[in-house]
């Protein structure tokens, strides 16, 4: 009703709405103002602009690749963890701070950037085009096992995870380390899609109970091919929550002793939220 009352302070109105929607019984029901709604939506999208890597600075002040996000421009060009980036075009990494480098990359979205990097002491040059990438799935192939790091569950996580599993399958990998530490969840449908890449078709991924006590079953999706693993080791901690816990439950229920969980007890969130967007850009998330 704020638009029907003249000169009503918008901040006061937001505080009133926030007070009405904040429940001690359910900390997951929230009203988001414009800034909070944008931040929440961005966190679910998992979308970033860049080369598709995370990195750290070494003693030479060069940028060492720590992770390469699957399906990104860096991934498509074959960059790997421990590659040491020396320069981007004429911009030397050792002479610039990380903020300058990141700004340069973002400013050249859609344009060729010449990258010089070291791998095992040998210098290489390649052209990368900074662009949009999903920052939720990292896939590494090691001697005898594969590692997939899943940071959250975005709209694209399911297909990116499927691509990662295909990569492990092509490499003949039969042991998977699935890192879900600090994964706070995201889209439940993404957990459904990811489960479908690991468990048999027609398997139950999870059951939902509505407010009337009615149960519905969600089954593994047919369009995702199961890649069989001889052993799956899941890494979890106290910040592993929501959709990540659904995924762990689906794997343990359907694959039994094939799955081993390692780490501390997960967060323990078994409820699903729905987000309702409003025309002014704010939104309401409720259980």
Region spans (language model):
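Extended, small/polar residue-biased N-terminal targeting/export presequences
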Residues: 2-62, 112-113, 120-127
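Conserved PDZ fold ligand-binding element
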Residues: 74-98, 176-179, 254, 262
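Conserved acidic, small-residue-rich alpha-beta core segments centered on
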Residues: 185-287
């Amino acid at each position: 009703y704020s638009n029907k009352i003249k000169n009503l302070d918008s901040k006061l109105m937001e505080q009133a709405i926030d007070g009405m929607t904040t429940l001690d019984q359910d900390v997951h029901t929230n009203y988001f103002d414009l800034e909070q709604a944008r931040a929440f939506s961005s966190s679910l999208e998992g979308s970033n602009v860049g080369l598709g890597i995370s990195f750290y600075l070494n003693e030479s002040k060069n940028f060492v690749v720590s992770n390469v996000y699957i399906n990104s421009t860096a991934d498509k060009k074959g960059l790997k963890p421990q590659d040491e980036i020396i320069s981007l075009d004429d911009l030397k990494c050792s002479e610039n701070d990380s903020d300058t480098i990141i700004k340069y990359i973002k400013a050249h979205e859609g344009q060729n950037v010449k990258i010089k990097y070291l791998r095992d002491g040998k210098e290489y040059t390649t052209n990368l085009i900074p662009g949009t990438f999903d920052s939720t799935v990292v896939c590494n192939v090691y001697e005898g096992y594969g590692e997939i790091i899943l940071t959250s569950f975005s709209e694209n996580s399911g297909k990116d995870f499927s691509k990662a599993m295909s990569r492990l399958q092509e490499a003949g990998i039969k042991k998977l380390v699935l890192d879900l530490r600090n994964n706070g969840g995201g889209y439940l449908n993404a957990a459904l899609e990811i489960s479908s890449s690991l468990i048999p078709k027609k398997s139950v991924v999870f059951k939902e109970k509505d407010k009337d006590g009615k149960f519905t079953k969600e089954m593994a999706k047919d369009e995702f091919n199961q890649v069989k693993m001889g052993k799956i080791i899941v890494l979890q901690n106290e910040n592993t929550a929501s959709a990540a816990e659904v995924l762990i439950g689906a794997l343990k229920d359907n694959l039994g002793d094939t799955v081993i969980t390692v780490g501390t007890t997960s967060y323990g969130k078994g409820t699903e939220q729905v987000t309702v967007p409003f025309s002014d850009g704010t939104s309401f998330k409720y259980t």
